[in-house]
Amino acid sequence: MSQNREQLMEELSTNVFAMFRTLRNDIGKIFGGYIPWNEFIVLRILNRANKEMVSRVANELNVSNSHITAVTEKLINKGFVTRSRSTSDRRVVYLEITEQGKDLVAKMEGAKKQYLQERFSALSEDEMNIMISISKKLI
């Protein structure tokens, strides 16, 4: 491997990590006035599905059922989610987003969209497509 390639890989990895850190920190600040990121992700899934089993949410996020239970307990206490048990199988627990939760997701998605529009305004559509293509190769 050439020394130039090694330098390029080092610079690329540094830039990618810096980009992700910046995006994560900025989104965290934007969402800080609402709810934490992990709660938002669960709400977003429930907003899409409206009602979902705890196990399916956990599988989609690749986390344990107990983690989802802990996160949703906070969302329930805030009035964003309700929990119910299946009438046919008491082991099955469903989560459902409330109207208040739907409103919050809409506000947060709007704030995120505005941030991303500003953040990526320096890139053309072609440049964004190139970045998407490259990032898919690395994932």
Where in the sequence are the language-model features?
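Charged, amphipathic alpha-helical coiled-coil/dimerization segments
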Residues: 74-129
